[in-house]
């Protein structure tokens, strides 16, 4: 299955880099401490095709956006639409300049926890 990249700063001709960014384990953004500053080195926003079982016993295929990024030797990942939207706004502003993000989040009006990010302007 081909990977459909939406946005990335990796060399998409490098198969090892593609594997590193799209396969294997990554730390979940949701588990990071709020207020933590994370320097971003490489990132990849891509579309992943998944299957899920339905109640009638059949399966259906769906697509979801996945964001992964690296900081040092660690890879982080999320499917949070809120986080992805904020992260991509930062990427657009920063273009090719180095940057770090600060992990933020809170609780929505309906009581669900969410994770987000903002640009670390002190980086």
Regions found by a protein language model. Give the residues of each.
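Short nucleic-acid-contacting surface segments enriched for D/E, G, S/T with interspersed K/R
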Residues: 31-33, 85-104
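Flexible glycine-rich surface loops and low-complexity tracts that mediate binding to linear polymers
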Residues: 42, 94-117
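Glycine-centered tight beta-turn/hairpin loop motif at sheet-sheet or coil-to-beta transitions
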Residues: 70-74
């Amino acid at each position: 299955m081909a990977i459909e990249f939406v946005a990335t700063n990796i060399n998409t001709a490098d198969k090892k880099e593609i594997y590193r960014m799209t396969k294997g384990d990554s730390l979940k953004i949701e588990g990071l401490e709020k207020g933590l500053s994370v320097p971003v080195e490489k990132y990849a926003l891509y579309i992943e095709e998944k299957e899920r079982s339905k109640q009638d016993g059949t399966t259906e295929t769906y697509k979801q956006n996945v964001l992964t990024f690296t900081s040092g030797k660690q890879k982080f990942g999320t499917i949070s639409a809120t986080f992805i939207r904020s992260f991509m706004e930062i990427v657009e502003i920063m273009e090719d300049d180095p940057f770090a993000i600060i992990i933020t989040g809170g609780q929505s009006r309906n009581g669900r926890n969410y994770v987000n990010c903002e640009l670390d302007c002190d980086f």
